[in-house]
């Protein structure tokens, strides 16, 4: 794997992981459209680790509260803000973990990795995000997250297993329709990403254990560092822009890219 390809993969993963434009969709498109070889599972794991560290750092205060609360939750107590947040995150993660396992065991994940699928999901779910963002009530904040909403957002997150959907995009869409204001919707989507990335990274990591060598470790470390920096910058920029800008720019990007991909796929 060339240095340029490595930098490109890490930058794409970092910049698109938390924006509602689908990182997995872009990574699938990279080899399909450029002729570059697939980056491999080891690099996938590395860029996931970099993205994970970025979101943990950005939302460290919330992560610390949830981590502390999880200790009380483990003792069967949901009597603190942290314990309740930890419970919500668990409930939000269970649906996608079950669905992801089923898809992996049945081989559906490989069947969905096509330019046409990504084109349709980019376009379709981009329009759904626009609808939800325009019609959402914006009367609720992230601090008002409920177990019911966590479960509903978790169900929506299942759709992110289809390349091109965008995990953050579909969970933000669900949150906006549930009445959460834009910053709150994005924050909840980002917090939900932490256990999801950990779970998917663990699954990918299990497939590469024992295959690592010095070159793979070096490439992985560089990819993780680059993904961390680009993800942190993208996350900070999005959260800042959401104070005054809607999700429409991301929708426009998704629609344009989706149409281009559909023309490419069917021509």
UniProtKB/Swiss-Prot annotation:
InterPro entries listed in its UniProt record: UppP
Pfam family, any one: BacA
Catalytic activity, EC: 3.6.1.27
Biological processes annotated in GO: cell wall organization; peptidoglycan biosynthetic process; regulation of cell shape; response to antibiotic
Keyword NADP: no
Localisation per UniProt entry: Cell inner membrane
Membrane topology: Multi-pass membrane protein
GO molecular function, one term: undecaprenyl-diphosphatase activity
Transmembrane segments: 1-21, 40-60, 83-103, 111-131, 144-164, 189-209, 219-239, 245-265
Keyword list, A-Z: Antibiotic resistance, Cell inner membrane, Cell membrane, Cell shape, Cell wall biogenesis/degradation, Hydrolase, Membrane, Peptidoglycan synthesis, Transmembrane, Transmembrane helix
Keyword S-adenosyl-L-methionine set for record: no
Reaction(s) this enzyme catalyzes, per UniProt: di-trans,octa-cis-undecaprenyl diphosphate + H2O = di-trans,octa-cis-undecaprenyl phosphate + phosphate + H(+)
A single GO cellular-component term on record: plasma membrane
Function: Catalyzes the dephosphorylation of undecaprenyl diphosphate (UPP). Confers resistance to bacitracin.
Family that this chain belongs to: Belongs to the UppP family.
Extra information: Bacitracin is thought to be involved in the inhibition of peptidoglycan synthesis by sequestering undecaprenyl diphosphate, thereby reducing the pool of lipid carrier available.
Name the UniProt record assigns to this protein: Undecaprenyl-diphosphatase
Species of the source: Roseobacter denitrificans (strain ATCC 33942 / OCh 114) (Erythrobacter sp. (strain OCh 114))
